[in-house]
Amino acid sequence: MQPFISHTGLAVILDSANVDTDQIIPKQFLSKVTRDGFGVHLFHDWRYLDEAGDKPNPDFNLNQPRYKGASILVSQENFGCGSSREHAPWALADFGFKVIIAPSFADIFYGNSINNGLLPVRLTDAEVKQLMAEVEAKEGAEIDVDLQALTVTSPSGALFHFEIAQSARHNLLNGLDAIGLTLSHVDTIANYEANIPSWRG
């Protein structure tokens, strides 16, 4: 997992509340167990007018030329609700998203995102609405997200602050998933095992 320090990127709006994981990555695309290749199916039922994915929906923001290459998604409350499938953050990351900004997230999705190097940022309703208005008003609008400073800078330069658990922040800054975090303590683990009394087996 790559460390996340800060990111400045093109922002795209998904102005919907309660975006569930079945909309993020529909169940028919969950047959793989590796993390790559899910981006093409991201928001499939909204991005395409047909089941095969041959007819893009021109009204969906991700299909509009002005949002091509977007890496920051701004959405509404309770993002990532529904089933606990880890494929949802996989699909978002594989598509190219680095940050998801919303007023609130489903708990399991929030944790899965952090474990996969995708930063979920919680801002107030008013701050999210301001970001959406600024992104909509200016083509090519970029947002800056600084995990070290815990700030979000809007396209106009407005500064918002966000909170994240210290442990999650540490893991993201250092590029540590669950396995990486365990390996970072390998010497301590080895020392503990070496000093276990023989009578304990």
Swiss-Prot record:
Enzyme Commission no: 4.2.1.33
Highest taxon listed in the record's lineage: Bacteria
Catalysed reactions, semicolon-separated: (2R,3S)-3-isopropylmalate = (2S)-2-isopropylmalate
Pathway linked to the protein: Amino-acid biosynthesis; L-leucine biosynthesis; L-leucine from 3-methyl-2-oxobutanoate: step 2/4
Pfam families listed in its UniProt record: Aconitase_C
InterPro entries with a match to the protein in the record: 3-IsopropMal_deHydase_ssu (IPR004431), Aconitase/3IPM_dehydase_swvl (IPR015928), AconitaseA/IPMdHydase_ssu_swvl (IPR000573), IPMI_Swivel (IPR033940), LeuD (IPR050075)
GO cellular component: 3-isopropylmalate dehydratase complex
SUPFAM superfamilies: LeuD/IlvD-like (SSF52016)
Function per UniProt: Catalyzes the isomerization between 2-isopropylmalate and 3-isopropylmalate, via the formation of 2-isopropylmaleate.
Family statement: Belongs to the LeuD family. LeuD type 1 subfamily.
Subunit structure: Heterodimer of LeuC and LeuD.
Listed name of the protein: 3-isopropylmalate dehydratase small subunit
Species: Shewanella halifaxensis (strain HAW-EB4)
Gene: leuD
